[in-house]
A protein has these predicted regions:
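Hydrophobic beta-strand segments of well-ordered beta-sheets in folded domains
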Residues: 41-46, 79-82
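Short, non-transmembrane amphipathic alpha-helical segments
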Residues: 56-77
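Functionally constrained cores in energy, signaling, and assembly domains
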Residues: 11, 65-67, 84
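N-proximal, solvent-exposed amphipathic alpha-helical segments enriched in charged/polar residues
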Residues: 1-43, 51-53, 122-156
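A short interface-forming secondary-structure element
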Residues: 48-61, 102
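A short amphipathic beta-strand at an alpha->beta junction
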Residues: 72-95
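An exposed acidic His-Trp-rich patch
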Residues: 87-128
Length: 156
């Protein structure tokens, strides 16, 4: 994970590689990245493609915050991470957003988030503190084995 660190939010390939290494796709399914680098603070927006079930929302938002902390720690000039996600039809089909700034991430982990990306040891300490390692997903893909595992039913 530390090897995927990049100094620049404007390096789209490096940021996407880092996001994949962080596990954004494993956590939330298919996604796109939009980078706002025309002026500071630079932002990385994740646009999640699959809808989320309401009962998974709280846990998913916590994972978004954890993923954002890792991104903010490992992209030197990144100032915020934003998320855009949909709820399922039975949860009002709404599009919602979440943003975490570097300052908010620092408060979340209790120290300057940028220092958490200064060394593999500092990164590992943050990951352990965040209880980061997870293999659960929060998204719904209609008609897949994943639906059966989580007892989901998608109503579109």
């Amino acid at each position: 994970l530390y090897q995927a660190k990049t100094p620049y939010a404007g390096d789209a390939v490096a940021v996407k590689t880092l996001a994949d290494t962080v596990g954004v796709g494993n956590h939330f399914g298919a996604y796109h990245i939009s980078l706002e680098t025309s002026e500071e603070p630079y932002d990385c927006q994740f646009i999640i493609q699959y809808p989320m079930k309401g009962e998974k929302k709280e846990k998913a938002l916590e994972q978004m915050k954890k993923d954002a902390c890792v991104m903010l720690a490992l992209v030197d000039n990144l100032g915020s991470v934003s998320w855009e996600y949909m709820m399922t039809a039975e949860d009002n089909n709404g599009v919602e957003t979440l943003q975490m700034t570097a300052e908010e991430a620092s408060a979340y982990v209790g120290k300057n988030i940028k220092t958490c990306g200064e060394s593999p040891k500092a990164l590992q300490e943050m990951l352990t503190q965040l209880d980061f390692i997870t293999d659960e997903g929060f998204y719904v893909v209609s008609g897949t084995e994943r639906d059966e595992n989580y007892n989901f039913k998608v109503v579109i």
